[in-house]
């Protein structure tokens, strides 16, 4: 982890959280809103990829938030050298996106990032797709805005 070169320099609190959490199997970032949890999570994924621990980074977020990961957070904080293929879930994708999505259900050749909206997990199609990606990869799974799935009895 000490050799990891960040794309955007972390603030002290972000570096501290990452230092204690980067190699944990299960972890939650209980930081205040606006303190850079997304950046910490992206850095964590980058570190784990460079250490050979993961080949796929999966982000589950609410519909209004998941596009921000693909369009802003990942491009801003994920180091270019990782050459991550970022794919955003769509239930009825055009042909080119369908090919990219289906490739996620195969063993990885490089670093992949899947961004899914949490609402997709309320559908059999979304559940089956995520399960196929998880079976084919060594993944870090991150849940943004986890209050949407906080109850064990929730349909998601």
Give the predicted meaning of each segment.
Residues 1-31, 35-156:
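SF2 helicase/translocase NTPase motor core
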């Amino acid at each position: 982890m000490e050799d990891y070169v960040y794309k955007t320099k972390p603030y002290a609190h972000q570096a501290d959280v990452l230092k204690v959490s980067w190699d944990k199997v299960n972890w939650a970032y209980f930081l205040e809103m606006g303190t850079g949890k997304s950046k910490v999570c992206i850095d964590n994924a980058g570190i784990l990829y460079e250490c050979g621990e993961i080949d796929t980074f999966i982000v589950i977020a609410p519909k209004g938030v998941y596009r921000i990961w693909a369009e802003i957070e990942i491009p801003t904080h994920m180091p270019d050298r990782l050459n991550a293929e970022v794919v955003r879930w769509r239930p009825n994708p055009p042909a080119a996106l369908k090919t990219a999505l289906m490739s996620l259900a195969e063993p990885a050749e490089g670093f992949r990032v899947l961004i899914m909206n949490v609402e997709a997990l309320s559908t059999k199609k979304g559940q089956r797709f995520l399960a196929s990606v998880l079976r084919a990869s060594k993944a870090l799974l991150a849940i943004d805005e986890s209050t949407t799935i906080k109850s064990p009895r929730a349909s998601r």
